[in-house]
Amino acid sequence: MYAVVQVRGVVKTNHEIKDTLKMLRLHHVNHCVLVPDTPAYLGMIRKVKDFVAYGEVDKDTLATLLRTRGRLTGDEKLTDEYVRAHTPYADIDEFAAALCDGEMSFRDLVEIKPVLRLHPPRKGYKTIKRTFQQGGALGYYGPQINDLLYKMR
């Protein structure tokens, strides 16, 4: 499972980029979505790689994000009680593990909001004009996306 975070805004960009970000449900900077590892999603991510940071998220980071930033309709927090009542899992940690393993989908919970609204990273981005490999904040992070997500929790 990939975590995709929008890093740059879309003013004066190609309409195809804007449409792809809209399909990924990334409407604002510092919003995060979780997408499965499928060729269709990877193609969309590659198209917007100059505007997002993405990588493979692990179970612990995903559980932390769901606890702090997971929201239900009505802007209520995602709780262990809600997960216990609406899934076969006992708490958010087990639900996050099932999400990472592909056993469960974010869409299986009807009332959960698909976008995680994150804070800007503590200590800031390095630069939003260069890729991660060049010392910036854009593009493919790999497993190091967990460090960025922890700073944005």
Swiss-Prot record:
A GO CC term attached to the entry: cytosolic large ribosomal subunit
Gene3D superfamilies: 1.10.15.30, Ribosomal protein L30, ferredoxin-like fold domain
GO molecular function: RNA binding; structural constituent of ribosome
Keyword Ribonucleoprotein tagged: yes
Membrane-crossing residue ranges in chain numbering: none
UniProt keyword terms in alphabetical order: Ribonucleoprotein, Ribosomal protein
InterPro entries per UniProt: Ribo_uL30_ferredoxin-like_sf (IPR036919), Ribosomal_uL30 (IPR039699), Ribosomal_uL30_arc (IPR005997), Ribosomal_uL30_CS (IPR018038), Ribosomal_uL30_euk_arc (IPR035808), Ribosomal_uL30_ferredoxin-like (IPR016082)
Keyword Cell inner membrane set for record: no
Cystine residue pairs: none
Pfam family name, one: Ribosomal_L30
GO BP annotations, alphabetical order: maturation of LSU-rRNA from tricistronic rRNA transcript (SSU-rRNA, 5.8S rRNA, LSU-rRNA); translation
Signal sequence, start to end: none
Quaternary structure, from the entry: Part of the 50S ribosomal subunit.
Family classification: Belongs to the universal ribosomal protein uL30 family.
Protein's name according to its UniProt entry: Large ribosomal subunit protein uL30
Record organism: Methanoculleus marisnigri (strain ATCC 35101 / DSM 1498 / JR1)
Organism lineage: Archaea, Methanobacteriati, Methanobacteriota, Stenosarchaea group, Methanomicrobia
Gene name of the encoded protein: rpl30
